[in-house]
């Protein structure tokens, strides 16, 4: 093992933060230093060049000196695992020609004052590392264990009379009737099952995978029910099948879209092209990943996002993920620096991450995966909820909801899968198998606390989004072949790993298969058959390809550097045979890292070839119907619970001034900015509405909108609805409200008909907890049989997670008492005390929870509505309430913020409900018609926090004050302001009052719609009623309450100085916001005369593995008159493409090699460490007739090639943002006078631009270099001054520098993303007088002019 030491691993503020936490345990403990350490295992008998390794890793051979009084600890990836960092870095170092098996990274932390006491050492260790993902070592030499390979695991046979014990030991979560079924089937086969067969059966038949409860028969309160839950959901599609192309039969549903043209490279020539305008389709899917997120929030949420992305990609014969959504429901946050009166102390489950950790780390994991894969996340929700119900029982989201969903494009001719034929190759596409995520399907199907802690760890997965990007590129290349797509049928690999995915692939086509485990790619030779077959290593797909197309498929994979293995063959006999060497060796050569197998014909395979286990039998040899045929069907016998006991909130004693502040500060209502700015929202170039709105960029959009293509203004919209706390009082109402809220949110988009809206329903419940099963049935029936059919809404896709409970004994980390009905609470519980007694059994149970995601095609996206109030004309705000005159407060946020920890909270009473479905239809049609008539200036739905929250948010977004008048809304100001009935607030011009009132009357909603407020220019919000002022707040006072959660979370998670700077700017009523200024006319196409000549210069759209911004880059160049070509670095390395054939190239944005060695460094290394490639680039830059553009990752890469770029010697390097966070913002740029060929005639302009990067802070070698560098773009504030304040300057670059050019202007690099906004509609906000062409299109047209 070689050990090299790198740069400092902790920034000053992170070091100080960690030291402060350590000193709460050991006051004398000090951190004296922290460094990255690289552990390298060379190939056997090989000696890597140490100087090259040091250059690539930016490391030193000698470690930093340790203080005399300090000792070192090493934080490394958990022993026995392979980190995502290692996967990508090892590939990069090998690609540079270095003979290594693996490189791994850890952190050396030097500490002075290390305690002698063992218990203190253990406590400190817990702060230094996360035992779910890391190990803590006492020396660098101990890291040798990272590379230890245990002896290969062996196959085990389980006696039929030992199935119950195996069920417990392996965490199979099998019911007794399933165990009896297995005993019967294997008894008939005359043999004992193998452990791998049992695990495969458990995964394939887990609640997570087979939805046994949703397919069960039911008896409720002694009465048999006619329909299963799933049958009631399917009823919605039966009643409204129109506009749905695929339902319940694939990884995602597919619905009709608008006419559009796909833009992608020609598979034969590589030239980008717009295809014919055809009716489009889009896939919709929403998943949850609750159990893994509860155990390890970052990887749990990351792989949740990754799994849903794969679902969209594996729809039909290949989809393309386009835009994502996310959501979290957790218990009280209990932020140490922001204590809240409604957050009572409570003992928490020691086996699960607390809510605060989940919300600090989980969203980062989900965002990081989306960012690196290259999918914008445009929508989300966040709920914090916790409520005492009785002794030892809390209704809460200790087991969180982690929602991951989205929509993807799919060609109409790719929607239907083709059945596999006998002889077809079974392929695993993607990364290698590792011992991670073992048993996740079964683990997520049981209550937390019912499985051993070691099984909790085993069920957590690890993420590698850059690998998933490569897989998607392969899928895209196959789909581009149209009817010649070699993929017949495929699935993503998720719960259960290959043991679920491959049998599903075969079963769905009515075939069997022979699978050779020896051909499965793995980075761990110690895996037993069970571990190899059942692990849930991520970023994998299984697919069927005809044998005759294997060579073609292999060439596509080789170009994308995407590993794959042909592991088996389909057979006519419906039998599954899995073993080692069950297929002839054939040709085992490969084109990607010696990992691709080519199969021989099926009839040469032997069922009983030798393989290396201690057992002479095959690991798996079963008829397919053992897995899919006649397993026992579940029956549920349920009874309704008694009436809820929570008292009703009495508003007479409340203070309105205080109530307003508390409601806005509740995390469910408060600003979600800290959850939004970490996620890229512009990648792909097709975003038309993200969360941020207006010149002041607040996250208040009601829905997300994407464009169907680059040449249309039509597209798709999606929204979320959820009102889960209401289910504790009325489960059916909660379900109706979720559907209603999804619709009121979606009304902000130009949706034309209700029947075009398709819903995804995600159901969560604590199955088996007293009364919950009956409430779940009520909720499903309420929307499946009643509401959705009445409104012509269908639910063609969904998911359930029915183990939403956690139980534990105080002081016993290993406790768990089964997945049955709720145990009787311990008699030792003291009802009035928040402090439990050791040994006491506690339980946390979530409400029945329905999350609705709504999707629909939309018309002209330029007619969308947002909560941004229009200023400059007399206007008024109207509230349209759908409660039928009722103002029900049961379950409201107002009730939650007045929880009393000495008694049951006053949460009860009648809840909001959708009493009349047709009233919602009338509302939808009113908003549609008013928008089409141009009557609506702004729109915001009413939800958590009531009309008061909606009005305040509109005021915040617009830097407006409000005069709110309640005279038309009753005598109780609390009910008027804080009821959460369905509805919306709209802004209309005062002169349009009569026209709007007439339209309201025509839709029979006159009694539902009244004026409620008037915008003012003063920084105050006033509420009046009954002829007097009831309350008045300063604008900043309310804003501070609303921003408090974001500020506190940012200070804990990010650079606290950055958090303070953003708060100061955000709360400034007089802040300028985005103030664009143009010195040119974007509609003037300066390239038109050159394009008219018919000459289109060739430009290479350059990408490396992990790059994801090539499509939008190509489109901009094509719009400007170029011929763009898709060029992968592998094309240049292998000589398929010659760089000299192009007049220019663009290095695109993304995460090349996952940015493992620093952003862009891996890409640059792949050029600089290959002499031929380095020479080719140097020759290209030396020519006077060429140009180059580097954006984001391409900018970072080109900055490291400055030694071979003439006139670039003063360029900086780009390092971690000052906030130490990925920053996705819309920032204001000034175009600086420079020689850049891209920016001619634009100097002096101030233009909003999309920013999305984690390492954009420019650092120059010296002040001389900074002064001499040719700056082309810089961040400014709304008044035109150079921006130094965060987030106006999102990365902390000196003087706001974010774009530079070479001395002759031919090579320009910039960190922001002008290529993502070729049209004004792509911008988060733009002035109303701008035309359709974005100012940034001028950059590309300037390049065309330069070419002549």
From Swiss-Prot:
It is found in: Cytoplasm. Phosphoribosylformylglycinamidine synthase involved in the purines biosynthetic pathway. Catalyzes the ATP-dependent conversion of formylglycinamide ribonucleotide (FGAR) and glutamine to yield formylglycinamidine ribonucleotide (FGAM) and glutamate. Its EC number is 6.3.5.3. One of its GO terms (cellular component) is cytoplasm. CDD domains: GATase1_FGAR_AT, PurL_repeat1, PurL_repeat2. Pfam families: AIRS_C, FGAR-AT_linker, FGAR-AT_N, FGAR-AT_PurM_N-like, GATase_5. PANTHER family: PHOSPHORIBOSYLFORMYLGLYCINAMIDINE SYNTHASE. It comes from the Bacteria. InterPro entries: Class_I_gatase-like, FGAR-AT_N, FGAR-AT_PurM_N-like, PurL_large, PurL_linker, PurM-like_C_dom, PurM-like_C_sf, PurM-like_N_sf. The keyword Cell inner membrane does not apply. It comes from Xanthomonas axonopodis pv. citri (strain 306). Keywords: ATP-binding, Cytoplasm, Glutamine amidotransferase, Ligase, Magnesium, Metal-binding, Nucleotide-binding, Purine biosynthesis. GO terms for molecular function: ATP binding; metal ion binding; phosphoribosylformylglycinamidine synthase activity. SUPFAM superfamilies: Class I glutamine amidotransferase-like, FGAM synthase PurL, linker domain, PurM C-terminal domain-like, PurM N-terminal domain-like, PurS-like. The active site is at 1192 (nucleophile), 1313, 1315. Monomer. Its main location: cytoplasm. Disulfide bonds: none annotated. This is Phosphoribosylformylglycinamidine synthase. ATP binds at residues 300-311, 701, 943. It catalyses: N(2)-formyl-N(1)-(5-phospho-beta-D-ribosyl)glycinamide + L-glutamine + ATP + H2O = 2-formamido-N(1)-(5-O-phospho-beta-D-ribosyl)acetamidine + L-glutamate + ADP + phosphate + H(+).
């Amino acid at each position: 093992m070689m050990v090299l030491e790198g740069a400092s691993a902790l920034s000053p503020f992170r070091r100080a933060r960690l030291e402060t936490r350590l000193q709460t345990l050991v006051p004398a403990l000090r951190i004296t230093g922290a460094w990255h350490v690289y552990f390298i295992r060379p190939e056997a008998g090989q000696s890597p060049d140490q100087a090259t390794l040091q250059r690539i890793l930016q490391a030193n051979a000698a470690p930093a000196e340790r203080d005399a009084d300090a000792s070192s600890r090493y934080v490394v990836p958990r022993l026995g695992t392979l980190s995502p960092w290692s996967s990508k870095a090892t590939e990069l170092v090998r690609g540079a020609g270095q003979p290594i098996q693996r490189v791994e990274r850890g952190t050396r932390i030097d500490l002075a004052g290390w305690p002698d006491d063992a218990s203190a050492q253990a406590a400190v260790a817990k702060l230094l590392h996360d035992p779910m993902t890391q190990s803590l070592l006492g020396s660098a030499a101990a890291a040798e264990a990272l590379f230890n390979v245990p002896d290969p695991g062996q196959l085990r046979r389980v006696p039929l009379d030992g199935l119950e014990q195996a069920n417990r030991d392996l965490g199979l979560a099998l019911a007794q009737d399933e165990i009896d079924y297995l005993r019967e089937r294997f008894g008939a086969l005359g043999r004992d099952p193998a452990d791998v067969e049992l695990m495969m059966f458990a995964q394939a038949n887990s609640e997570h995978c087979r939805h046994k409860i949703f397919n069960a028969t039911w008896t409720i309160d002694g009465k048999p029910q006619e329909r299963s839950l799933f049958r009631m959901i399917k009823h919605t599609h039966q009643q409204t099948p129109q506009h749905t192309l695929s339902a319940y039969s694939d990884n995602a549903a597919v619905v009709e879209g608008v006419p559009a043209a796909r833009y992608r490279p020609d598979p034969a020539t590589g030239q980008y092209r717009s295809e014919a305008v055809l009716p489009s389709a889009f896939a919709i899917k929403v998943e949850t990943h609750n159990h893994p997120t509860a155990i390890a929030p970052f990887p749990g949420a990351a792989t949740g996002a990754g799994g849903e992305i794969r679902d969209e990609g594996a729809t039909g014969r290949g989809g393309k993920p386009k835009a994502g959504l996310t959501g979290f429901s957790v218990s009280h946050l209990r932020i140490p620096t922001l204590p809240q009166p409604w957050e009572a102390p409570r003992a928490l489950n020691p086996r699960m991450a607390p809510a605060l950790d989940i919300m600090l780390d989980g969203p980062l994991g989900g965002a990081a995966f989306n960012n690196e894969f290259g999918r914008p996340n445009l929508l989300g929700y966040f709920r914090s909820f916790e409520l005492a119900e009785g002794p030892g029982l809390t209704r809460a989201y200790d087991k969180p909801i982690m929602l991951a969903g989205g929509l993807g494009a799919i060609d109409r001719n790719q929607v239907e899968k083709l059945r596999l034929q006998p002889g077809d190759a079974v392929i695993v596409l993607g990364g290698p198998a590792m011992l991670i995520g073992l048993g996740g399907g079964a683990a997520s199907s049981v209550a937390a606390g019912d499985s051993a802690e070691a099984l909790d760890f085993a069920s957590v997965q690890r993420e590698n989004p850059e690998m998933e990007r490569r897989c998607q590129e392969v899928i895209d290349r196959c789909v581009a072949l149209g009817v010649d797509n070699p993929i017949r049928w495929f699935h993503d690999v998720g719960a259960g790993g290959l043991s679920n995915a491959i049998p599903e692939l075969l079963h769905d086509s009515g075939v069997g298969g022979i699978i050779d485990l020896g051909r499965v790619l793995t980075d761990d030779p110690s895996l037993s058959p069970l571990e190899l077959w059942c692990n849930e290593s991520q970023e994998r797909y299984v697919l069927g390809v005809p044998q005759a197309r294997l060579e073609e498929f292999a060439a596509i994979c080789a170009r994308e550097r995407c590993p794959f293995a042909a592991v088996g063959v389909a057979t006519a006999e419906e039998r599954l045979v899995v073993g080692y060497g069950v297929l002839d060796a054939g040709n085992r050569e490969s084109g990607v890292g010696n990992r691709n197998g080519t199969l021989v014909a099926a009839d040469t395979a032997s069922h009983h070839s030798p393989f290396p286990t201690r057992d002479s039998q095959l690991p798996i040899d079963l008829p397919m119907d053992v897995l899919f045929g006649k397993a026992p069907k579940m029956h549920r016998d349920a009874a309704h619970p008694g009436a809820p006991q929570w008292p009703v909130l009495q508003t007479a004693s409340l203070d309105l001034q205080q109530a307003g502040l508390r409601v806005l500060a509740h995390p469910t209502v408060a600003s979600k900015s800290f959850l939004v700015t970490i996620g890229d929202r512009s990648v792909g170039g097709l975003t038309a509405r993200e969360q941020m709105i207006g010149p002041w960029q607040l996250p208040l959009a009601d829905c997300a909108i994407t464009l169907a293509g680059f040449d249309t203004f039509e597209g798709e919209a999606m929204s979320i609805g959820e009102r889960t706390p209401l289910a504790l009082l009325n489960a059916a109402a909660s379900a109706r409200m979720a559907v209603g809220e999804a619709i009121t949110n979606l009304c902000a988009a130009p949706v034309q008909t209700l029947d075009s809206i398709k819903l995804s329903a995600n159901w969560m419940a604590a199955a088996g907890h007293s009364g919950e099963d009956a409430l779940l049935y009520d909720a499903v029936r309420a929307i499946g049989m009643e509401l959705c059919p009445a409104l012509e809404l269908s639910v063609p896709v969904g998911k359930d997670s029915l183990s939403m409970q956690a139980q534990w004994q105080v002081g016993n980390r290993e406790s768990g008492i089964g997945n049955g009905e709720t145990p009787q609470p311990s008699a030792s519980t003291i009802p009035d005390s928040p402090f439990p007694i050791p040994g006491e059994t506690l339980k946390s149970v979530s409400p029945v929870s329905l999350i609705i995601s709504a999707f629909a095609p939309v018309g002209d996206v330029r007619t969308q509505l947002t909560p941004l109030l229009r200023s400059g004309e007399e206007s008024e705000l109207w509230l349209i309430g759908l409660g039928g005159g009722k103002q029900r407060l049961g379950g409201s946020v107002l009730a939650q913020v007045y929880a009393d920890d000495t008694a049951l909270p006053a949460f009860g009473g009648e809840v909001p409900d959708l009493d009349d479905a047709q009233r919602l239809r009338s509302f939808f049609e009113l908003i549609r018609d008013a928008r089409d008539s141009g009557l609506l200036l702004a729109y915001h739905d009413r939800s958590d926090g009531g009309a008061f929250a909606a009005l305040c948010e509109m005021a915040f977004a617009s830097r407006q004050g409000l005069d709110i008048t309640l005279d038309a809304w009753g005598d109780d100001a609390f009910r008027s302001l804080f009821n959460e009935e369905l509805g919306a607030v709209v802004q209309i011009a005062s002169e349009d009052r009569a026209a709007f009132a007439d339209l309201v009357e025509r839709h029979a909603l006159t009694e539902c719609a009244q004026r409620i407020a008037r915008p003012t220019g003063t920084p105050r919000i006033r509420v009046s009623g009954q002829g007097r002022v009831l309350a008045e707040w300063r604008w900043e006072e309310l804003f501070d309450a609303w921003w408090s959660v974001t500020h506190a979370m940012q200070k804990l998670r990010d650079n606290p100085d950055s958090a303070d700077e953003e708060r100061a700017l955000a709360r400034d009523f007089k802040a300028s916001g985005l103030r664009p200024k143009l010195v040119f006319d974007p509609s003037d196409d300066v390239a038109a005369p050159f394009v008219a000549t018919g000459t289109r210069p060739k430009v290479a759209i350059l990408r490396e593995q992990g790059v994801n911004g090539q499509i939008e880059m190509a489109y901009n160049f094509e719009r400007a008159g170029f011929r763009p070509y898709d060029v992968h670095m592998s094309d240049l390395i292998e000589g398929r493409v010659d760089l000299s054939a192009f007049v220019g190239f663009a290095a695109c944005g993304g995460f090349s090699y996952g940015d493992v060695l620093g952003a862009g460094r891996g890409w640059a290394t792949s050029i600089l460490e290959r002499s031929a490639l380095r020479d080719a680039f140097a020759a290209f830059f030396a020519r006077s007739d060429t140009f180059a553009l580097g954006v984001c990752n391409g900018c970072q890469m080109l900055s490291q090639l400055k030694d071979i770029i003439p006139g670039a010697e003063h360029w900086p390097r780009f390092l971690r943002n000052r906030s130490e966070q990925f920053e996705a913002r819309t920032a204001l740029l000034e175009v600086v006078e420079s020689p850049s060929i891209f920016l001619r005639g634009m100097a002096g302009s101030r233009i909003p631009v999309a920013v999305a990067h984690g390492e954009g802070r420019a650092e120059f070698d010296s002040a001389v270099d900074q002064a001499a560098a040719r700056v082309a773009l810089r961040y400014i504030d709304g008044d035109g001054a150079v921006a130094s304040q965060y987030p106006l300057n999102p990365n902390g670059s000196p003087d706001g520098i974010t774009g530079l050019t070479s001395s002759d202007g031919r090579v320009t690099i910039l960190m922001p993303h002008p290529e993502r906004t070729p049209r004004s509609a792509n911008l988060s906000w733009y002035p109303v007088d701008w035309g359709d062409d974005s100012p940034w299109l001028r950059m590309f047209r300037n390049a065309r002019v330069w070419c002549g």
